[in-house]
Structures are given as C-alpha cells and as structure tokens.
Amino acid sequence: MGTFCSVIKFENLQELKRLCHWGPIIALGVIAICSTMAMIDSVLWYWPLHTTGGSVNFIMLINWTVMILYNYFNAMFVGPGFVPLGWKPEISQDTMYLQYCKVCQAYKAPRSHHCRKCNRCVMKMDHHCPWINNCCGYQNHASFTLFLLLAPLGCIHAAFIFVMTMYTQLYHRLSFGWNTVKIDMSAARRDPLPIVPFGLAAFATTLFALGLALGTTIAVGMLFFIQMKIILRNKTSIESWIEEKAKDRIQYYQLDEVFVFPYDMGSRWRNFKQVFTWSGVPEGDGLEWPVREGCHQYSLTIEQLKQKADKRVRSVRYKVIEDYSGACCPLNKGIKTFFTSPCTEEPRIQLQKGEFILATRGLRYWLYGDKILDDSFIEGVSRIRGWFPRKCVEKCPCDAETDQAPEGEKKNR
C-alpha cells in the first residue's frame, strides 16, 4: 500500500521518548524474539540457506520483520495529526456548533477529541494505543492497521518454523501417510549435523517464542478485524459510542427524530479509500470531511453538544466527606472498593473534605466526575476529573432533582 511510500519525519528528538514506555518495550521485545528465533531455527536446525527453499524462507522472514517495524514506527512517529493550537473555523458563526478545548485553547474540529495522554486535540481520534505510545487517528490509521495485519501474518510464518524445527529435531523425520503417498522431510535436517546442537535451552527458547507468536496472532489479529470494521464503516470507536448514546438519548426523551451518522458514505470501498491511498496520505486535511447526503460538517458535533447538555442535566452534585489520596486501589476505603477499582487508564482524583464534585457516571463503589472549581470556566484552566470512591462523598440534598431531567425539559428536547 501507499503507506510504504511515506517518509517518517521527526518534528524533534522529543518524539524518541515515545520508545521509553512499557508498551513499545514489550511490543518491540516480542517482535525481536519471534523474528530472531525464527531466523536462528531456520538457519541452524530446520531449513539451511544452501537450499533454495531455505533461502526463500529466510528472505521472507527478513521481509516480514522490515515491513512490521516500518509500519510500527510509522504509526508511532508520524502520529495521528493534531488540531492546530488556537484553531477555529473560518466562519466565526460556526463556533456555536463546536466544543471548546481549554487545554489547547482551540475549538474541537469535527471528529477530533482531546487526548489526556498526548495532551492535544487529535484529528479523527480512534483511541490512544499504549503499544505505540501514541494515538491512532487521521494520519497514522493506515500504518497502524497495516501493522495489525502484518504482525499476525509474520507470527504465523514464525510459528510454522518453530513447530517444524521442534518436530524435525525431536523425531528426525516427518511423514504423512495417505495410502501410498509419503512426504519425507528428513532432507530439511543438516548433513552433517549443525555446529550448534538443538539442546534443552534451544528447545525451551523455541517453545517460548512459539507461545509469543501464537498469542500475538490471536490478540493482534482480533484488533485487526476490529479496525477493518471501523474503517469500512468510516466510524471510529469513539464515534460508535457517540452514535449509541444518540440513540439512547432519542429513546429516553421519546423524540421524533432519527440520528444519521454523517461520515458513512454508504459504500465500503469509498470508506476504505479515505484511509488507504496509493500516495500513503489519507484523503482530506483532517479538519473537514466529506459527508453523506442530507448531512453537513457539523451534524455530529451538534449531536455531541446535545449529549453534553444532557450530561449536565443528568449529573449529580456530591459533597466530599472523606479525604482521598487518589490511590488506584485504596485499601483504607474498604475491601469491596479495593477489589472493584475501575480497570481503566482514566485518572483518579484527590479529594479533600468539604470539596464538591459533579458526578456524571459511576459503578457500584466508584464514581466519575469533575471537581467544582471557582475558576473552572476561566479560559486555560484544566478540568480536574476522574474516578473516586463512592464512600468518600454524599449526595447534596438540594441537587437531588438533577438525577433526572424535568418533564418540561424532556418535551423541549
């Protein structure tokens, strides 16, 4: 694909810091172990280079490694593309259809979302991937998806090498008996014997690499199918969630309207071409998008504003009655709170007695919300939001009516 024609560019050397994270360290470690062991097993014990098949096999292994690493680093260092700081639409009246990001001090372009990890508004944000320590979005979606495709394919090849190496070295002969047909693989062994014997250490290492290869094939293969489903529908993971909430909002308030997702062009091929191009550069500029008939540039952002307003209506005000340090699994808040801590990268927030929180969602023993600050609406002041134990707060009696919208508001929505 055209992704291979693109050039990895470093805006600055700070991008190299993305490698100093557990995600890339594990990912690159798995790639290194599987590719290195596949080459060693092939050359020493299974398919020697002096045979035609062995040479072709070795070249294919190198090719898999190069393509996997290229798309991996492309996805990591090219990045998703960020909305320019201070961005606003050309027509000033259009700002009424957009949300404002206080951190970036810019309006959120259609399909963009603010990432807490990257601390920027990301174009066509799908998710923040810990394995590349970057977001998956507009500019790197193709490279990321190709990596998800190539990694399982390379691991399947490597797994075949591992299995055949262990089989031929342990049994010295491989035969399939179908009536009178026999396939003799004994020629795959070195004659004379290899310089390095296939001992216990080699067997254990090959078996470990086989486990990594099979696990990667299953896990990354599933992620590839999820991403292809997203691409063919031209709908990111976040946008799928927005669409579901739109349907819930319409059903909850019994509205006489239908939400139509604006970016699905009605053709899987047209949706596919927006991400994968021969030039390696995705269609558009990441700020404006082609939409289906009957929709416009702000169809989705208007729905987001409606959901945000609905979120404020449904939010509940709480007062902090116990201090909370912000620990991930606080044992001093009870055993149930400790073991039911949310499995998410979303932050926990410190609480001090007397503070007020506006909770928007929650679990049985945990709540998620924003601290109510006097200067929370001043431009440039970041919101303080995250998870906290439910037992640390109590509902404010005067705000009990905010648990659900008044009937009058439901009719007006």
Curated annotation (Swiss-Prot):
It comes from the Eukaryota. It is an enzyme of class 2 (transferase). Residues 46-57, 165-205 are lumenal. It is a multi-pass membrane protein. Residues 99-149 form the DHHC domain. Homooligomerizes. Interacts with SELENOK. The active site is at 129 (s-palmitoyl cysteine intermediate). Endoplasmic reticulum palmitoyl acyltransferase that mediates palmitoylation of proteins such as AMFR, CALX, ITPR1 and TFRC. Palmitoylates calnexin (CALX), which is required for its association with the ribosome-translocon complex and efficient folding of glycosylated proteins. Mediates palmitoylation of AMFR, promoting AMFR distribution to the peripheral endoplasmic reticulum. Together with SELENOK, palmitoylates ITPR1 in immune cells, leading to regulate ITPR1 stability and function. The DHHC domain is required for palmitoyltransferase activity. The chain crosses the membrane at residues 25-45, 58-78, 144-164, 206-226. InterPro entries: Palmitoyltrfase_DHHC, PFA4/ZDH16/20/ERF2-like, SH3_domain. The gene is ZDHHC6. Residues 313-398 form the SH3 domain. Palmitoylated at 3 different sites by ZDHHC16. The combination of the different palmitoylation events strongly affects the quaternary assembly of ZDHHC6, its localization, stability and function. Palmitoylation at Cys-328 accelerates the turnover of ZDHHC6. Depalmitoylated by LYPLA2. This is Palmitoyltransferase ZDHHC6. It comes from Homo sapiens.
